[in-house]
Amino acid sequence: VSAEQSLFPYYTDDKITENNENTGSKVILLVRHDERTSLWEPFSERYSGNYHIERNIYKNVIGTAILFEEINHSLGLTYRYAWRTSDTFGFVKTSWLINFGRSCCQATLLDGIQNILPDNVTSLTQNTFSNLLDAYKRSEVDLETGLAIFALNSILTDLAEPRESLLATTVMQLGLENVDYYLSSQILDRFRTGMSIVTETEVRGQRCAYFVRTEFELGSGTERSWHLVADVIQDSAAIVNLTNNLISNRSAMIKTLEREIEVNNSNLKRIVASADGMQVSSDQLCTAHHFANVMFNVMRGGIFMDQYNILKRDFIEFVHMRNC
């Protein structure tokens, strides 16, 4: 984990709380039942009291996924999203919209992430020159693939020398069809009020954002799911490779993504198991607590290379050094 290679600004907890409306995940829904259209903005306090809602937060036992859930009993809909990671794909935001009501509905979805950091932005720069930094930001999206690239026009410097920013942050969507793309948060209020919004292909001098808009019908007892996938430290070769995969293998990428996440989970379990972190008992909470403790110990101190086997020569040298 590095504050110098983050997807969002690396802030203290109080700033994260204060900026929850303009940083990170943001979803807005226009839901139509018959002739009535309802505006629903999950996890926002803008329309507090308008609906009978229930909110939950979950984390899996091994700590690789965190899931946020808002149940709207008034509309008969549940929206969930989870943050997970993948060695190959980066940060994965997976969303689900579930209709548990008795009637079908038509949903217009606007989903995305805000205040994305381009690459080559240090935490010191973000915390000291955040407003100046915005002027250097450039966002663009390839409409054919939906792949967005967020970069700096140049690295901030007060010296008379060229300093190119050759790395970027990328975001793409998987699982949605007939999608419009937007690159700034300025379209949010227009969407809330039902006004038309124009697809954006390039934005300069503004905080980076990635939004997708689409419409679909959701029958009673059915659900839709999709992914927003972001990664940092991407060079031109990686971006070209990702673009080609989106063109030729888009449908297969979802299965590859889920398989990759499962492989990462298995690898983490194997690492923790090598430090005796796996146990089974009648107390599930105690078992989960033990796993977490061992995992954090491993993060601090590492694991043995070959279980409890060591080289005789190394052991003799260690004993000699400590006792001479």
Name every feature range the model reports, one short phrase each:
Residues 1-324:
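Anionic coordination/interaction segments
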